[in-house]
Amino acid sequence: MAAQSYYNGAYNSPPAYEQHDHTSDQFNRVSPRPSPSPVAYNNAPYYQSDDPHDPNSLRYSQQSIGSDNGAYVAGGRINEHDQYAENIPLKSANPYGNDHPPQPWMQQPTHYAPDPGMMEPQVPMRQKKKGFFQKKIAYVTYILTIAQIIVFIVELVKMGQLTGSPIQTKPQFNPMVGPSAYVQINMGARYTPCMKNVPGVQNATQQVLFPCPNATTTDSDCSLSELCGFDGVPNPHPGGSLDDKPAPDQWFRFIIPMFLHSGFVHIGFNLLVQMTMGADMERMIGWWRYGLVYLSSGIWGFVLGGNYAGQGEASCGCSGALFGILALFVLDLLYGWNDRQNPWVELIIMVLGIAVSFVLGLLPGLDNFSHLGGFTMGLALGLCVMRSPNALRERIGLARSPYVAMSGGVAAENADPDQNKTSTGSNIGGLGKFNPKGFFAGRKPLWWAWWLVRLGALVAVLIGFILLIVNFYKYPSSNCSWCYRFSCLPVNGWCDQGNLFSR
């Protein structure tokens, strides 16, 4: 009965859709037709509608990343109080700001950066200077150049006062276009009779006279002391011997001639090389290395010339010192041979320059022995004071920072000042902080082998210098009877100018 009354009750058939009250059901309400977006999505990809029924609203959007080529909008819940809003963040809008997005991983470079320790140190950029001070000032080069110019002006003035002309024209013309050799001797050129007893002077059987500094003829009217100048030297007397005491002892003629020059051609060529190649080398290796090689090469050259050149030949000029600097350029080329773009071209240019200089050394007033001696000393000292070859530094794991350790070089001026503050050791003569224990610790066998080469070069030049000095003062004349021809041309009697006695 109950079941029959239920199925046969007032509701014999279910109510129609139209008979249902839709206003009271908040979950089954028919949503109004969504209104179109005010702008197309393709034209405004970041447009966000406030209407939740907008198909472009973020409430109903999960755009396909793979199919959408446009910019991605910010997904996720916009209204935190809307329980039906999606909260799945896909991608933030414009994550790179104004920068470009990174390349795909397949297009990114795969090579690794080189080891910083094996690279040349980066020189920090400084504010560029204009004019004469654009580069680092080569103080030693400029001081030497100024001194040599002043001395040459004094030579010309003295020559003009003594002879009436600053340039020698009588009894013969000076091919270097400058003062006579007698004025140069009087001002300190290397002249063997003013430095020691020589055959044909101290052991002469009759009085020996020399040309005067003001001579314009071939006459000899002055004594040796008047020609040598300064405080004078003991004059030889007839019937003397090579053992006479006191003997001439103007040893400073091994040093002073570096500041004297025999003419405009001589000083012009030397200063051109000195102000270009010399200044560049000083900037590269530092003032104290440059000054050491310059002075040592010049002195060594005059010592060698005093032993083997003609004893009656006067010699002056800084050519020997410049040949020592040229030797440093040769070493620098050989050290970095594989790093040079055209090493053979540079070597050929250097060889040609050396050959031309030796040809000029055959002219009066110049000395090829000074050139040879200066070049030899430059090579030996270069091995001692310059950096190691690049190939050796790479094998023993040293960075290519040549001249920072003891300052004064091209890398030292750009060195980090904080690094100098933190280094330990003693500051010797302002040359930089040096820590012997840390310097020699952990060195490899190749490093020690190269330092043995350096030590051998230093010992060799010291022994050679001592032997040449002893030989110069021990033996009155050279044991090589033909060596003097290496420094003169047998024309116009040039080789006879050095003859004080018959050979």
Curated annotation (Swiss-Prot):
Pfam families: Rhomboid. It is an enzyme of class 3 (hydrolase). The active site is at 319 (nucleophile), 371. This is Rhomboid-type serine protease 2. Probable rhomboid-type serine protease that catalyzes intramembrane proteolysis. It catalyses: Cleaves type-1 transmembrane domains using a catalytic dyad composed of serine and histidine that are contributed by different transmembrane domains. GO terms for biological process: proteolysis. Keywords: Hydrolase, Membrane, Protease, Serine protease, Transmembrane, Transmembrane helix. Its main location: membrane. It is found in: Membrane. Residues 1-136, 275-283, 338-342, 387-449 are cytoplasmic. The keyword Membrane applies. It is a multi-pass membrane protein. InterPro entries: Peptidase_S54_rhomboid-like, Peptidase_S54_rhomboid_dom, Rhomboid-like_sf. Residues 1-11 have a biased composition (Polar residues). PANTHER family: RHOMBOID-LIKE PROTEIN (PTHR22936:SF69), RHOMBOID-RELATED (PTHR22936). The chain crosses the membrane at residues 137-157, 254-274, 284-304, 317-337, 343-363, 366-386, 450-470. Belongs to the peptidase S54 family. Residues 158-253, 305-316, 364-365, 471-503 are extracellular. Residues 1-66 are annotated as: Disordered.
